[in-house]
């Protein structure tokens, strides 16, 4: 993960001064993708993605959203500092393909919930989700100082589960028939997490493989 030094300093300074909102200038660069902070101008894009049944069918809110509902999310979650949300930009195509975020940021217990969706069909199955998960866990532990990042995923979503595992998330438990789907059936949900100690161990091992 590549943080511009000035951007990193600005982010840390803003938090030290008591500002809890995400620095709008931060950029996180990986091999395939760049993560940039979400803006109000992204609203039509988010609404288009969230209106696709192939997208919202994997989410816990299985319905399209309106622009007003998304703007409400930005006001109540992102601008309030409860959520740090990024747009995933595909470097090869130089276009947005999805969004990723840490929400319910708890600054007392140093934990947050991870979530992601890929909106563009051409970006699926290319490892972009796995890379986004790795970049966001780096961001959460390095920049936010978190101790734990957790997520919820449908037990039937094998592709997402494999992606989370590759980023270091471990299964904590299975919530049986925890979610009632639109068709009336109940679905099991997995809870997964990664701890700071596990992230450090994984990062050390990866650095050793590439540099030892």
Regions of interest found by a model, annotated:
Residues 164, 169, 192:
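Conserved active-site tyrosine of GNAT-family acetyltransferases
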Residues 18-71, 198-212:
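A short, well-structured alpha-helix characteristic of acyl/acetyltransferase catalytic modules
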Residues 142-152:
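Conserved GNAT acetyl-CoA-binding A-motif
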Residues 8-21:
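Short, Lys/Arg-enriched N-terminal segments with co-localized hydrophobic residues
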Residues 125-139, 162-166:
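Conserved acetyl-CoA-binding loop-helix of GNAT-fold acetyltransferases
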Residues 94-98, 159, 186:
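Glycine-rich acetyl-CoA-binding "A-motif" of GNAT/NAT acetyltransferases
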Residues 150-153, 170-187:
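Conserved catalytic-core motifs of GNAT/GCN5-like acyltransferases
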Residues 65-122, 195-197, 208-211:
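Acetyl-CoA-dependent GNAT
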């Amino acid at each position: 993960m590549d943080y511009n030094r000035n951007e990193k300093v600005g982010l840390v300074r803003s938090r030290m001064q008591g500002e809890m909102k995400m620095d709008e200038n931060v950029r996180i660069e990986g091999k395939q993708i760049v993560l940039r902070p979400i803006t109000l101008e992204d609203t039509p894009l988010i609404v288009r993605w969230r209106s696709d049944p192939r997208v919202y069918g994997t989410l816990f809110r299985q319905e399209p959203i309106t622009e007003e509902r998304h703007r409400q999310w930005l006001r109540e979650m992102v601008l309030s500092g409860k959520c740090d949300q990024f747009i995933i930009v595909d470097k090869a195509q130089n276009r947005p393909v999805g969004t990723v975020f840490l929400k319910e940021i708890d600054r007392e217990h140093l934990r947050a919930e991870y979530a992601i969706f890929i909106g563009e069909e051409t970006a699926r199955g290319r490892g972009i989700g796995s890379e986004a998960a790795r970049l966001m866990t780096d961001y959460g532990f390095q920049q936010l100082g978190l101790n734990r990042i957790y997520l919820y995923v449908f037990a039937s979503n094998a592709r997402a589960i494999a992606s989370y595992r590759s980023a270091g998330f471990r299964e904590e438990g299975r919530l049986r028939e925890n979610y009632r789907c639109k068709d009336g059936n109940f679905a099991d949900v997995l809870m997964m997490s990664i701890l700071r100690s596990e992230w450090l161990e994984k990062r050390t091992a990866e650095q050793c493989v590439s540099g030892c």
